[in-house]
A protein has these predicted regions:
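Transmembrane beta-barrel strands of outer-membrane/channel proteins
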Residues: 1, 57-63, 137-141, 150, ...
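Signature of Gram-negative outer-membrane beta-barrel scaffolds
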Residues: 1-130, 146, 150, 164-166, ...
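Residues that define the transmembrane beta-barrel architecture of outer-membrane proteins
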Residues: 36-40, 115-119, 184-186, 238-240, ...
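Residue-level signature of outer-membrane beta-barrel architecture
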Residues: 46-50, 61, 117, 125-128, ...
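Membrane-embedded beta-barrel scaffold of Gram-negative outer-membrane proteins
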Residues: 128, 136, 140, 146, ...
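Short loop/turn motifs that connect adjacent beta-strands in outer-membrane beta-barrel proteins
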Residues: 132, 199, 252, 309, ...
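Gram-negative outer-membrane beta-barrel transporters
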Residues: 206-215, 222, 226-328
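C-terminal beta-signal and adjacent terminal beta-strands/loops
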Residues: 317-333, 351, 358-437
């Protein structure tokens, strides 16, 4: 990207004159690079079956090559300062010609990124209990490379003049020294499927996942005492939960239900959390907090009646609220500093969708079909975004001073906090015609 800036910014003419200027990649106002990373993966799987036992074994191989370079000295990434060797007494060291000797350890040079290689074993086990029940267990490693932006962002390593104002990507892959590695999830699951009668089945699953090497930002201090952030892996999270399923089928009628009870915890909710808190002189989080996708209850149910000529299906979704950071107005600054992220939950929400089809008689060999889709049948206004002060949408804590100080020719003060995107989409109806020939 390139930012369009005012050429008079930071001068006495800033408020009266404007001349657009586009800076190049040697400044903090642009980030331009061209890279060609390479990625390869392969998966092997084998199955063993004997009597009531089935065992699946798999192994996945992933290779990623950023195909780029990175600075060898993170404390002086662009060689903005030159450093020379000094003697113990503090005087400069000279070579045989009387010239100053550059301190190579404090200077940076381009270094090729390593190729990241990962092996992920997977194991599945199933045991049939009689004719109408199956006990199953699974274990597996799942690896995911960080997003490309975490590798290539600010590739020129331009560090701004103020602390905590700059972030750089990290192409030092597969390294234990301020490196960037794949995020690793180790998953365990055990479950039981039981046929209650020929038309009904029930399944229960217990699962637990460890998430290692979550993306984070480490703080690096340059030799000029400017602190900036660099992507690395140092955060951890885990997920544990219970899943219940009930399926019913009778002729043209079907019912499918799914309920999940889940906890998600970690020491940081997003990669920049620790970096931002440190930049704001806020203590780091020293306990597990709910992650942004933590959702205690999830319940889905589908009801349908389908024939060869017509059919209709209704699906309902219920979700308990996800976390947000409650920051009440009027609290002391010390109390606000000590508030942990994601300390409260948004309101729960539900949605009902409806789909249907009708196969019309053929016309000149063509088969027309009518399709119906209704999203959010009840036109429910689910609150997906909330105010950090009230915990609800379209609300805020406003005093008279704030109202009197508002000056605008374009909007009212209420427009500041009444954001329509906080709510779910309204009812949507689609009718379609499909012609098969």
């Amino acid at each position: 990207y390139r930012s369009i800036r005012n050429a008079y910014a930071g001068t006495s003419l800033d408020s009266d004159f404007y001349r657009p200027v586009v800076y190049d990649d040697t400044t903090v106002y642009a980030d331009v690079y061209k890279v060609k990373p390479r990625e390869f993966s392969a998966y092997l799987q084998d199955k063993f079956e004997k009597d009531e036992i089935v065992i699946n074994f798999g192994l996945r191989y992933d290779q990623f090559d950023a195909n780029t370079t990175f600075p060898s000295q993170r404390r002086n990434p662009t060689n903005s300062s030159t450093y020379y060797l000094q003697k113990i007494d503090g005087t400069d060291s000279l070579d045989i010609n009387g010239n100053l000797i550059i301190d190579e350890e404090r200077m940076s040079s381009p270094k090729n990124s390593n190729i990241s290689e990962q092996y992920s074993p997977r194991l599945g086990f199933a045991y049939q209990l009689g004719r109408v029940a199956v006990l199953h267990f699974s274990y597996g490693h799942f690896l995911q490379m960080p997003p490309m932006s975490a590798i290539f962002e600010n590739k020129s390593s331009i560090i701004g003049p103020t602390d905590y104002s700059s972030v750089v990507g990290n192409a030092n892959l597969n390294s234990d020294s301020l490196g960037l590695n794949a995020q690793k999830t180790v998953s365990y699951e055990v479950g039981l499927w039981q046929e209650i009668n020929p038309n009904t089945s029930f399944e229960v699953n217990l699962y637990y996942r460890d998430i290692y090497d979550l993306l984070s930002l480490a703080v690096v201090s340059t030799y000029n005492q400017i602190e900036y952030g660099i992507y690395t892996n140092k955060d951890y999270g885990n997920v544990r939960g219970l899943e219940l399923k009930l399926d019913y089928n009778l002729d043209n009628i079907f019912i499918q239900t799914n309920y999940t009870y889940q906890f998600t915890r970690g020491n940081a909710d997003n990669p920049s959390q620790t970096f931002s808190r440190q930049g704001s002189s806020i203590d780091k989080v020293i306990r597990f907090i709910p992650m942004s996708w933590d959702q205690r209850h999830t319940f889905n149910v589908s009801l349908g009646y389908n024939t060869s000529k017509y059919g209709i299906t209704s699906t309902g979704y219920y979700n308990s609220g996800t976390p947000y950071t409650f920051s009440p107005q009027g609290e002391s600054n010390l109390a606000l500093l000590n508030l942990y992220p994601n300390n409260d939950y948004k309101p729960s929400n539900y949605t009902i969708d409806l789909t249907g089809y009708l196969n019309l008689p053929k016309v000149f060999g063509f088969q027309p079909n009518l399709n119906l889709l209704i999203r959010n049948v009840t036109d429910r206004r689910n609150e997906y975004g909330v105010s950090s002060e009230t915990g609800r949408s379209y609300t805020a804590v406003v005093d008279d001073t704030e109202l009197l100080s508002h000056r605008s020719d374009f909007n009212s003060y209420e427009d500041r906090y009444q954001d329509p995107s906080m709510f779910s989409s309204p009812r949507e109806i689609k009718v379609g015609l499909t012609i098969k020939f």
